[in-house]
Curated annotation (Swiss-Prot):
[3Fe-4S] cluster binds at C9, C17, C50. PANTHER family: FERREDOXIN, OXIDOREDUCTASE. Its cofactor is [4Fe-4S] cluster; [3Fe-4S] cluster. [4Fe-4S] cluster binds at C21, C40, C43, C46. Keywords: 3Fe-4S, 4Fe-4S, Electron transport, Iron, Iron-sulfur, Metal-binding, Repeat, Transport. Transmembrane segments: none annotated. The gene is fdxA. Binds 1 [4Fe-4S] cluster. Binds 1 [3Fe-4S] cluster. InterPro entries: 4Fe4S_Fe-S-bd (IPR017896), 4Fe4S_Fe_S_CS (IPR017900), 7Fe_ferredoxin (IPR000813), Fd_C (IPR022569), FdxA (IPR054829), RnfB_subfamily (IPR050294). The keyword Iron applies. This is Ferredoxin 1. One of its GO terms (molecular function) is metal ion binding. Residues 2-30, 31-60 form the 4Fe-4S ferredoxin-type domain.
Length: 107
């Protein structure tokens, strides 16, 4: 099993989760983070660290966000690895909690 970054990370990109990951399985796009499913060891350290509550265990991803399972896998293959915490995006607080942000995902 793996953990999955979902919709609410888009346009927020808090990186608190990256800092606690023991296997460095996070990958960074312009306005979103993903978890590489083959590298995640299912330790669950990242989930409570996410201020946006955007990380779920794969078997607990909400029904309306199932597409993020495949999206994490796909984008982790092309985006660079991130291993250190960075500042969140400048307007993260404004976007935190906004529903339906997939259309704003920058690849």
């Amino acid at each position: 099993m793996t953990f999955v970054v979902t919709d609410n990370c888009i346009k927020c990109k808090y990186t608190d989760c990256v800092e606690v990951c023991p296997v460095d399985c996070f990958y960074e796009g312009p306005n979103f983070l993903v978890i590489h499913p083959d590298e995640c060891i299912d330790c669950a350290l990242c989930e409570p660290e996410c201020p946006a509550q955007a990380i779920f265990s794969e078997d607990e991803v909400p029904e309306n966000m199932q597409e993020f399972i495949e999206l994490n896998s796909e984008l982790a293959e092309v985006w660079p690895n991130i291993t250190e915490k960075k500042d969140a995006l400048p307007d993260a607080e404004e976007w935190d909690g906004v529903a339906g942000k997939l259309q704003h995902l920058e690849r």
